[in-house]
Amino acid sequence: MNDIAIDKEHLHYLEQLSEMYPTIGKASSEIINLQAILNLPKGTEHFVSDVHGEYEAFSHVLKNGSGAVRKKIDDVFGLAMNKADKAALATLIYYPREKMELIKQDEPDMDSWYKTTLYKLIEVCKTVSSKYTRSKVRKALPEEYAYVIEELITEKPEVLNKEAYYESIINTTVELGTAEEFIVVLSELIQRLAVDHLHVLGDIYDRGAGPHLIMDRLCRYHSLDIQWGNHDIIWMGAAAGNPACIATVVRNSIRYGNLDVVEEGYGINMLPLATFALKAYKDDPCTRFVFKVAPSGADNMESDLTVSYTHLRAHETL
């Protein structure tokens, strides 16, 4: 066999690979696996930009995948389901607990509704999982329901009477009283599988009241990348202790009525600053720093600061 010339750079990588795949069989198996993955449809990528701290709107966009979930419902049921029922199913997937509370008020036979709904969710779940390998789907499954969900969404040619097999699993779920929790789990799994990767483009922070909640949500997200915006950089600078960034963050938070982000979101006491401002600038109209929120919001914030200052003065005189 002829000697193959290998430069040092490539040799380093080959040595690393030889530790991961020490035999021809293991290397071949991995090549086959990767080639199979390349032949699967590309996972859905979701782009969101300029979130600006609006947590409720951002959360809703994540739940529906900017229409990706509704499209899957259309793909699965087509003309077999009318628009109203599709919209109701979509809402259930986005907000399962809240929707079920509303259903209970009008539905006389909840057990029947549970069974029908579970069948629908399983069909949607099969479709959204079809882009991925079994291994990837398995990793996305919640541990306590992993086996049952995998049984329901995986084709089993060895099972001759599939309908009876699925029906027995669903009936048992309803009889055990776990149907509601199972519906929540399936709904969240559909949300999870509908979007393979999230791209967040710029300005998580700014005017909205929930950027810290958005960051918490992103920390739990399965796959994402972030392109930071100028407002995000300012908050990073403030966290790092830069005086100019700190002043800008406080100024913006006050002008847009979002001091709760600083005080409740990050636990920073703003009362000393409010006390100083009320003393030092009590006769200054500060026209260059007027509120940009609605007048009622500005009045509420000013009232809160005044009450805090009054309480502080009362405490000092005791």
Where do the language-model regions lie?
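Extended charged low-complexity segments that act as oligomerization/scaffolding linkers
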Residues: F77-E101, A238-F289
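Active-site environment of divalent metal-dependent phosphoester hydrolases
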Residues: E54-Y55, D206-A209, H231-M236
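N-terminal low-complexity, Ser/Thr- and acidic-residue-enriched intrinsically disordered segments
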Residues: I6, E19-S130, S303
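A short acidic-Thr-Gly-centered motif at the start of a beta-strand
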Residues: E30-K42, S187-H197, G210-R220
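Divalent metal-coordination and catalytic microenvironments
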Residues: D50, D203, N230
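Short secondary-structure boundary/capping segments
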Residues: V61-G67, I214-L218, A239-V250
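Low-complexity, highly charged intrinsically disordered N-terminal segments
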Residues: L102-S187
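Conserved small/polar residues in nucleotide/adenosyl-binding loops
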Residues: T310-T317
